Amino acid sequence: MDKWQELTITVNREAEEAASNILIECGSQGVVIDDSADYLGKVGKYGEVFPEVEQVEMVTITAYYPESADMTVITAQVNERLAELTDFGLQTGQVQLTTQELAEEDWAENWKKYYEPTRITHDLTIVPSWTDYEVQAGEKIIKLDPGMAFGTGTHPTTKMSLFALEQVLRGGETVIDVGTGSGVLSVASSLLGAKEIFAYDLDDVAVRVAQENIDLNVGTENIHVTAGDLLKGIAIEADVIVANILADILVNLTDDAYRLVKDEGYLIMSGIISEKLDMVLEAAHSAGFFLETHMIQGEWNALVFKKTDAISGVIGG
């Protein structure tokens, strides 16, 4: 009987996505994110999350590794990478880390019990790939395999990115998805009517995972996934650029984004903790963008900029 090794960490919610990516990059074959806020919170019309959702500070992330993996080495690597997150302004809190072995069938089923179809926006619902789901009138379904990597698409930064895409896409646009991760934003863009989507990620694992998730969804042949370092070397003009990544990285792509976004086009930036907000705003304004929408969920922020004169607004709570 094949066995797997389970590595569980408990971190502050704001470090959830970054910590999940670290576990994947250190060789995990899948992650489970156990966060009650994903399912207990009510989401308002414009993406605001009610206060009770943010009361639980810590989340538990479980990663699965092959029996042959050297968990002593992996544990040391994970600890080192988690410590580096503070350099990006992310507070991990008091990290707790445990390991155990489990049988193949337990690994295959354990993470599935955490996931169920989740309505994210007015039109978009994320559905685990193994679930039989009856689509409602007007509902657009994004199929994901959360066992692969990068969570389920229900993190506040992803939710706000999806709300923003729903806000700006009208059909026929070219979209660039920077740091695509699971590919969820690219799939959503296709479902919302974008003509062509170009998705980039520096991590080869993310490129593979994104393509696998894209292939789960019908009509996504208009999504092209390749490895890339932000927007460096890209010459494609886009109606919309979306980036859900760390704030320190976002500030490095604003000039290239302004070069690539068409007039009257949009730049959507998410993954911004409140203490880094001014830094991102300054970088985008310096590049020439005007703020159109500011969404807030707890300590997380998402910004929608336009390449034109605009009136700024704030959504959230």
Curated annotation (Swiss-Prot):
<dbReference type="GO" id="GO:0016279">
    <property type="term" value="F:protein-lysine N-methyltransferase activity"/>
</dbReference>
<keyword id="KW-0963">Cytoplasm</keyword>
<dbReference type="GO" id="GO:0032259">
    <property type="term" value="P:methylation"/>
</dbReference>
<dbReference type="InterPro" id="IPR050078">
    <property type="entry name" value="Ribosomal_L11_MeTrfase_PrmA"/>
</dbReference>
<feature type="binding site">
    <location>
        <position position="201"/>
    </location>
    <ligand>
        <name>S-adenosyl-L-methionine</name>
    </ligand>
</feature>
<comment type="similarity">
    <text>Belongs to the methyltransferase superfamily. PrmA family.</text>
</comment>
<dbReference type="GO" id="GO:0005737">
    <property type="term" value="C:cytoplasm"/>
</dbReference>
<keyword id="KW-0808">Transferase</keyword>
<feature type="binding site">
    <location>
        <position position="244"/>
    </location>
    <ligand>
        <name>S-adenosyl-L-methionine</name>
    </ligand>
</feature>
<keyword id="KW-0489">Methyltransferase</keyword>
<protein>
    <recommendedName>
        <fullName>Ribosomal protein L11 methyltransferase</fullName>
        <ecNumber>2.1.1.-</ecNumber>
    </recommendedName>
</protein>
<keyword id="KW-0949">S-adenosyl-L-methionine</keyword>
<feature type="binding site">
    <location>
        <position position="158"/>
    </location>
    <ligand>
        <name>S-adenosyl-L-methionine</name>
    </ligand>
</feature>
<dbReference type="Pfam" id="PF06325">
    <property type="entry name" value="PrmA"/>
</dbReference>
<feature type="binding site">
    <location>
        <position position="179"/>
    </location>
    <ligand>
        <name>S-adenosyl-L-methionine</name>
    </ligand>
</feature>
<dbReference type="InterPro" id="IPR004498">
    <property type="entry name" value="Ribosomal_PrmA_MeTrfase"/>
</dbReference>
<comment type="function">
    <text>Methylates ribosomal protein L11.</text>
</comment>
<dbReference type="InterPro" id="IPR029063">
    <property type="entry name" value="SAM-dependent_MTases_sf"/>
</dbReference>
